[in-house]
């Protein structure tokens, strides 16, 4: 009998195999247990003196009669049944030309891959470079300050997530998540992402995975073009007929998936100019904070810090002001990672976080950000974009106009005293830092809320608010500052037919998995409407 067995717990105080723990949970001898497959694995650190690994598994168990009845009486044990995948009925309307996807981030890659698998021969257009060239350009920027507006942390194969921690978590509960994770594994991601409660691939594994997805699209009859910057849409009778590239080349398109990413500000401006439905939306801005990873490990795991089965600890922290108008929270926490320069425009400083798969840098970093909305940046579809740009340019100027970032030790920030770079970590941001009061590069309502929030976080995580941490600014690209309006069922733009806004850049996702899922659903919507390309 194949059983789904939840909450199989193994204490780190014990030396026990997973098979032994399953047998103990079920009350069966070892010889009655067949194959075991992990469905989910999580760390339960609620009791610092007895941290456990908690597994959900699928197991083949030789049982029947009374024993089977006894097992199934346990609320953690059920008889396993294969989940039925939703069927896809392909549409019948003919496409006037192959579909085009703008942007090779997670949303664009999945939108293209899904249609390639069903014979739609999509054309994927990426404004930046392939991963290998992009990595060289980014490394040059970090080492020398030589900025390339066409190839950077935001633009290029894989999107902004290529230089991140590679988190594959999401709050969206969708049965297609498992299928997407399997696609990632098939493309080169490690298999443990299929069951880890907090899966991540790291920037190093993610780069290989992205290349695998692009290759698969080409193998299935699609095509990928780099250095293909879409600067305009070919619109007739409020329907998109094609796209126009930088340089004037026109490409016909039977449908256009717009997965441009959250930093494609020139694309946003073009859409607004062309009358495409686009509105401002709230987002958040702030700083990156760096602590010794050992401090976070001790705060989260106590005496088990450093245990080989735990890895580098993460955290998620939230603080609401007394009047409930502002929230400070950690975002995109990168255990064992580094702070990176993430500008996409000349003359602006942007910071982000990144980790390798092993998360072994010895430094924990996270964004600490505060919510902003129209009361802060005003009216207008692109008001949020201008708000971001203003503080990025302030940071650039304050740090010496060289892509150095303004930074301040936590103690001086909390005390509003003379800023310094003295801290307990070796600062990881490159090309370098300039000691600067962060009050000069962020609005007062952000820095004031951060001070309150960090003080609160220190009561939740031991040592968090003590001296020794470093703050680096500015973090402005937490999510898209706009939403490109679309129909909830058909995914089509509310103003222009055959245009399908998609992913994080369109305001419908926040992270690799939710963006990939949105690309998946947009692709299905197009396939349910149109027939494959002949």
Residue spans of the language-model regions?
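Residues forming the flavin
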Residues: 1-51, 57-163, 167-187, 191-534
């Amino acid at each position: 009998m194949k059983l789904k067995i939840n909450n199989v717990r193994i204490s780190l105080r014990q030396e026990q195999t997973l098979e032994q723990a399953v047998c103990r949970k079920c009350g069966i001898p070892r010889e009655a247990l067949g194959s075991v497959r992990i469905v989910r694995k999580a760390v339960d650190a609620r009791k610092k003196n007895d941290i456990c690994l908690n597994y959900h598994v699928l197991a083949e168990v030789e049982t029947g009669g009374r024993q089977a009845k006894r097992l199934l009486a346990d609320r953690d044990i059920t008889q396993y049944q294969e989940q039925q995948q939703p069927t896809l009925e392909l549409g019948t309307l003919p496409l006037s030309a192959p579909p085009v996807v703008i942007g090779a981030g997670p949303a664009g890659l999945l939108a293209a891959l899904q249609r390639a698998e069903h014979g739609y021969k999509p054309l994927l257009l990426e404004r930046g470079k392939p991963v290998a060239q992009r990595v060289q350009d980014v490394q040059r920027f970090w080492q020398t300050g030589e900025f390339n507006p066409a190839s950077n942390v935001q633009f290029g194969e894989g999107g902004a997530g290529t230089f991140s921690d590679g988190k594959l978590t999401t709050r969206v509960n969708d049965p297609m998540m498992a299928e997407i994770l399997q696609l990632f594994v098939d493309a080169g991601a490690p298999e443990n992402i299929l069951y880890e409660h907090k899966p991540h691939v790291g920037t190093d594994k993610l780069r290989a995975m992205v290349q695998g997805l692009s290759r698969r699209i080409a193998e299935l009859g699609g095509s990928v073009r780099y250095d293909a910057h879409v600067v305009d849409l070919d619109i007739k009778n409020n329907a998109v007929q094609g796209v126009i590239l930088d340089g004037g080349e026109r490409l016909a398109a039977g449908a256009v998936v717009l997965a441009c990413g959250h930093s494609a500000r020139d694309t946003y401006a073009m859409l607004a100019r062309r009358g495409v439905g686009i509105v401002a939306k709230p987002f958040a801005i702030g700083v990156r904070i760096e602590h010794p990873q050992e401090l976070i490990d001790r705060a989260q795991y106590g005496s088990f810090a450093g245990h080989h089965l735990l890895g580098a600890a993460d955290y998620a922290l939230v603080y609401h002001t007394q009047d409930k108008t502002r929230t400070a929270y950690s975002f995109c926490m990168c255990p064992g990672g580094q702070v990176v320069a993430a500008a996409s425009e000349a003359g602006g400083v942007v910071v982000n976080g990144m980790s390798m798969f092993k998360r072994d840098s010895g430094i924990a970093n996270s964004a600490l950000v505060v919510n902003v909305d129209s009361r802060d940046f005003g009216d207008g579809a692109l008001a949020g974009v201008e708000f971001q740009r203003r503080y990025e340019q302030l940071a650039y100027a304050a740090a010496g106009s060289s892509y150095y970032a303004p930074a301040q030790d936590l103690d001086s920030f909390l005390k509003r005293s003379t800023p310094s770079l003295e801290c307990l970590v070796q600062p990881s941001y490159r090309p370098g830092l300039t000691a600067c009061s962060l009050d000069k590069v962020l609005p007062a309502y952000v820095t004031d809320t951060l001070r309150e929030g960090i003080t609160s976080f220190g009561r939740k995580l031991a040592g968090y608010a003590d001296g020794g941490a470093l703050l680096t600014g500015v973090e402005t690209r937490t999510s898209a500052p706009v939403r490109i309006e679309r129909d909830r069922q058909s995914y089509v733009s509310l103003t222009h037919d055959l245009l399908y806004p998609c992913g994080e850049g369109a305001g419908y996702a926040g992270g690799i998995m939710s963006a990939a899922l949105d690309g998946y659903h947009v692709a299905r919507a197009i396939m349910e409407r149109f027939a494959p390309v002949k």
